[in-house]
Amino acid sequence: DDTWEVIQRAIAERQHASPMELVALQQPGKGKADAVRVGFARATGDVLIILDADISVPPEELPLFVRALDDDRCEFANGSRLVYPMEAKAMRFLNILGNKFFGYLFSYLLGQPIRDTLCGTKVLRRSDYDRIVANRDFFGDFDPFGDFDLLFGASRLGLKIRDVPVHYKERTYGETNISRFSHG
C-alpha cells in the first residue's frame, strides 16, 4: 500500500498554492477516533473540522458548518446525510435503517434532535473540544469512530447540537473499513 507516499506527494504538489500549512500525520493507534484525536491535538485553529477522506460529503459544504457556529445557531455542528436525497449506492438500506434508529435513540437520550449520529462531518470549537476531552473519562473509551464520544460529550457539557444537512455521495475513493455487523 503506497498511501503514505501518495499523500506526501500530494502535499508537496499543493503546499505552495494553499493559504494554510498542509500536514500529514501517521496515527500511532487504529481507527477513526484515534485519527481524529491525533489530528485535533496537532491542529492550531480555533475551529476543528472532521471530514471523512472518502469525500462522500463534498468539502464545499464545510462553510455551512462554520457559519452555523459563527451565527450562534449551535456550538456543535453535526452533519446529517438523511435529509437530502442521496446517490443510489451511497448508503446501503440496512445502514440507512441503523442510522435512523441511532438518530431517534440519541435524540431521546440527549434531549436534542439529532438525525444522523454517524455522519463523519462534524465541526466544533477547540475550546469545546478541549472540555469534551477533559470529561472523556465519564463515558469511557468505547467508541472506535468517535462520533458517539463527541455527541455524548457535547451533550453532557450542555452544548447546543444542530444538524447541518449534507449531500451524501457514493464513495469514489478507497473501500470502507467498517463492517455493518461487527461495528454496528
Task: Give residue ranges: language-model regions.
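Acidic donor-binding segment of Leloir-type glycosyltransferases
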Residues: 1-25
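Acidic donor-binding/catalytic loop of UDP-sugar-dependent glycosyltransferases
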Residues: 2-6, 51-68
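Active-site phosphate/pyrophosphate- and oxyanion-stabilizing loops and adjacent acidic/basic residues
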Residues: 5-8, 37, 63, 152
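Structural element of the ATP-grasp superfamily
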Residues: 7, 105, 129, 150-154
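Acceptor/aglycone-binding surface of glycosyltransferases and processive sugar-polymer synthases
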Residues: 20-22, 27-42, 47, 59-140, ...
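Cofactor-binding loops of NAD(P)H-dependent oxidoreductases
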Residues: 25-28, 51-53, 164
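Residue-level signature of catalytic and energy-coupling elements of molecular machines
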Residues: 39, 54, 125, 154, ...
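Catalytic donor-sugar/metal-binding loop of nucleotide-sugar-dependent glycosyltransferases
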Residues: 139-140, 151-169
